[in-house]
Amino acid sequence: MFDRIDVAGEIQMTSQDSAKLHGIFSIPVYIAKRDSDLTSNEEKDISSIVKEGMGKNTGNSVSENSYIFNDKLEKIKEFCEQQLKIYVEQVIVPKKEVDFYITQSWLNITKPGEYHHLHTHQNSIISGVFYIAAEEDDKITFSDPNTKLKGMIKFEKKAYNTVNSDTWWFPSIANELVLFPSWLNHQVNVNEKATKDRISISFNTFARGKFGLRKDLNELILK
């Protein structure tokens, strides 16, 4: 079962005990905690990746090596793959056998005063971020793709929830993994209280197997 899954689900109405508000067409953001802390070998791998070179990104830095899971951080990769499998089985629920796998993977370093621009991940189905180091008030913020449609008429709100918000954030916690649809816009705002570097691993995924249906003329077989 999910360690924690955040979607717009049932919201209890305060006015009537028998009334419920249903959030349909929810966007699944999955968060899972790894039991073990960073090992000394993993710390060495992180240092090695940094020494290989860091390039400038819009607002922060990313590793020159964009396939870090290929030969480093084996246990973290294994954990991410296990959680990816759970996400696929319980969110996508594919009828046919489909093999999801990690494609590119890279290290992010966000120093105090830096940020990570609003973006999506192209050529990917599910994306993930695993936090190596984070401080209090570090967070990842997601943006509702339907904001333009829902915002045709604006109201001032006295409280925010997953139904009436244009953005929603989750705290960034060391040893936690966040999985989300690759098309979902997300960003990292400046943490004004930061005193240390925020370090994370991001990755993309794709799948092998059968997509679609032959009778609908949208079947795709990837091996």
Predicted regions and their residues:
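Short beta-strand His + acidic residue motifs that chelate non-heme Fe in jelly-roll/DSBH
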Residues: 116-119, 186-193
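Catalytic core of non-heme Fe(II) oxygenases with the double-stranded beta-helix
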Residues: 110-179, 210-219
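Exposed beta-sheet edge/beta-hairpin loop segments within beta-rich domains
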Residues: 168-171, 190-194
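A short hydrophobic beta-strand segment most commonly corresponding to one strand
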Residues: 127-130, 195-211
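Conserved double-stranded beta-helix
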Residues: 75-139
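Short conserved micro-motifs at the rims of enzyme active sites and ligand-binding pockets
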Residues: 43-44, 191, 212-215
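Non-heme Fe(II)/2-oxoglutarate
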Residues: 2-94, 115, 219-222
